[in-house]
């Protein structure tokens, strides 16, 4: 990727990652771009621990509509969330589990507030299987152990960023789309970030940062 396009968000990987971590600490979303030879998409990501209905509404409005909760394998086991399919043959091995809904405190489960309730229920320290109904309108994703050093996906990036910011290892993500329904690529993501004041980084930035700091 042409790094000059990212210069407004930091001149180095270190700067961009630190800006993103600070944004997370302040409860603000960040935009993460993956490799051009992978999905070549940008996801808007919020810490699951602090996401608000207003932020969820922005994900729904400007994203693909598939709002995902990225969590660790340990959390999936705690909630007894099996894979969505027995044999995952998707190109990037995206690890969807069965979809979920909070068992209490929601109506249809579709609204921004209901989806936030479902997320907060799922990441609660003492959350158990019976706190959730299946299927639902939130799509959990199981992050690979080792984060972006193991798999260079938005799922792992969101969990890594949450951990680096001092939050529970859980992030909420959605792919950003253009007005015509096509997927937003780097130039559109940069313009979107400037319009709404988001930080931007790449998964490669995060890999470089983790390797440099051995974290």
UniProtKB/Swiss-Prot annotation:
GO function terms (MF aspect): 3,4-dihydroxy-2-butanone-4-phosphate synthase activity; magnesium ion binding; manganese ion binding
Annotated site (Essential for catalytic activity): 137, 175
Residues involved in Mg(2+) 1 binding: 39
EC number, UniProt record: 4.1.99.12
Alphabetical GO biological process terms: riboflavin biosynthetic process
Cross-referenced InterPro entries: DHBP_synth_RibB-like_a/b_dom, DHBP_synthase_RibB
Keyword Metal-binding part of the UniProt annotation: yes
EC class (word): lyase
Subunit structure: Homodimer.
UniProt similarity note: Belongs to the DHBP synthase family.
Entry function: Catalyzes the conversion of D-ribulose 5-phosphate to formate and 3,4-dihydroxy-2-butanone 4-phosphate.
Entry protein name: 3,4-dihydroxy-2-butanone 4-phosphate synthase
Organism: Haemophilus influenzae (strain ATCC 51907 / DSM 11121 / KW20 / Rd)
Lineage of the organism: Bacteria, Pseudomonadati, Pseudomonadota, Gammaproteobacteria, Pasteurellales
